[in-house]
């Protein structure tokens, strides 16, 4: 699994998950995780925080998802953006599946000369609360097909 649980000194009662750079043997800075594969972690405690950026695409089920006490109703086609350190809470029983594109800031910084590139992305600005958008069915289908293709064929190589 690509999540590491560690004790968070600032928020002792909230699990913190760390990006696992060597999941496939060599170092990586980006990964795609299928939501149904992380439910076992959410069964322990659906409230958690991450040390990396997360763009979650919901493909099945409807429910609620909260980030830093801001609750969002989500359904298939919704995309949720979150930053490191935000407190997240999943409605794990109703949000059935989807994909999370997870990455560290180092991933984007390695491709762009601007060290603050990720902060310039509107959904990841330091003072902005998390955001949710809804994609049209045709756009979400294309994105999910691409994610599925890369997840199955590229990450398994």
Regions found by a protein language model. Give the residues of each.
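Conserved hydrophobic/aromatic beta-strand scaffold that supports enzyme active sites
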Residues: 32, 55, 79-81, 100-102, ...
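Short beta-strand His + acidic residue motifs that chelate non-heme Fe in jelly-roll/DSBH
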Residues: 64-66, 82, 87-93, 99
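Short acidic-glycine-tyrosine-enriched beta hairpin
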Residues: 69-83
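Short, charged/polar surface micro-motifs in flexible loops or helix N-caps
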Residues: 38, 60-62, 85-87, 105-108
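Generic protein-terminus/edge-of-domain signal
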Residues: 1-66, 70-73
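Well-ordered beta-strand positions in beta-sheet-rich domains
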Residues: 71-73, 87, 132
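A hydrophobic/aromatic-rich effector-binding and dimerization subdomain
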Residues: 3-4, 11-27, 91-154
